[in-house]
Structure formats: C-alpha cells, structure tokens
C-alpha cells in the first residue's frame, strides 16, 4: 500500500474577489519528487502557504504525514517539513554560517556542528564565512535549501526554486534535489511555471 506524505482533498482557498485554489485533490507518495506545475497566479504558492500553516484553507482538507490539518498534532508534523516559500528567508548582512546558526536556534536543534556539513551538501562548502549580500541568486537559493534542511526534514517544499537562475544554476539546483532525494530519502515537492526545466 502506498504511503503518502501529503494528501489534499478538494482543497480550496478563496479571497474576496477571486479563488486561488478551487477543489485541489492530490497525493504525494513518500520518497518521491513531485512537480507541481502551473502558470503564474495558478495557486502554487497558495497551496504551499496552506500546507506550511501560513494560511487557512477556505474549504476541503489536507493531511501531512497522515495527520489532518484540523488536528492539533499538525503543528508537530510541520516540524518534519522544510520549506522555501517564494524567496529564501535569509539575512543578507549575515554570513552563510550565521544564517544557519540562527535557524538552528529558532528550531531549537543542536545542529551547530552540522552547519559545515549542510553547506557542503548544498555546494557552499567554501562560502560559510562570506556575507550573503555578496552571493549570486543561485547561491542564495542553495543557502535557502540548506536552511530548510536544518531541522532534518522528511519533506522538502520548494516554491519556484529555479526562478531567475541561469542554465548552469538550474542544473545545479536540479542535481541537488536529486541528491537529497536519493541519498537522504527526502520527499520533495517543487512548484514551477517552467515545465520543461522542471522535468529534464
């Protein structure tokens, strides 16, 4: 029997003058890489904001790791999830290491000793002492993914991770996602409006 890390059932999000999501039903198998593709404004970011608990649905429901969104246990389930929503939440005046230390402090994890390992994992091993304001867009995306990995998640959610990247940057992010899935068994949900780049 297939085990799903995320299931949505007729999930809906209405705003005053429009619907961002209208009855979305989807199932993401544990251990998969799942591409969520649609044009800009199709509701991809809205879905991600809902499952991250940043907004409440107008209708329908979802389960995360088998727990319904209406169950109080959903809060602890979200701790098994790492996300980069819209753009990475990073501090430009801090170094890469300081950004990761800050996230470890927020999550109350004892992950300080794993910071160099995380930076190495995302291809930023030699940049830990550099201020983020000097990073390229691709480096910022990779640091955002490292921060999302700080809590050792089972489920990684990436909102438009290749947006604005050059061809080499797209290749690097795609290879990183495959590596995380194969070597760490992390389930990945990727939203993108570029079907061709996502599916290669």
Predicted feature locations:
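Helix-to-loop junction immediately C-terminal to a conserved catalytic motif
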Residues: 52
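Conserved ABC transporter NBD signature motif
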Residues: 60-70, 76-77
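Conserved ABC ATPase "signature" region
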Residues: 101, 112-127
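Catalytic Walker B motif of ABC-type/P-loop ATPase nucleotide-binding domains
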Residues: 156-160
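Helical segment within the ABC ATPase nucleotide-binding domain
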Residues: 171-184
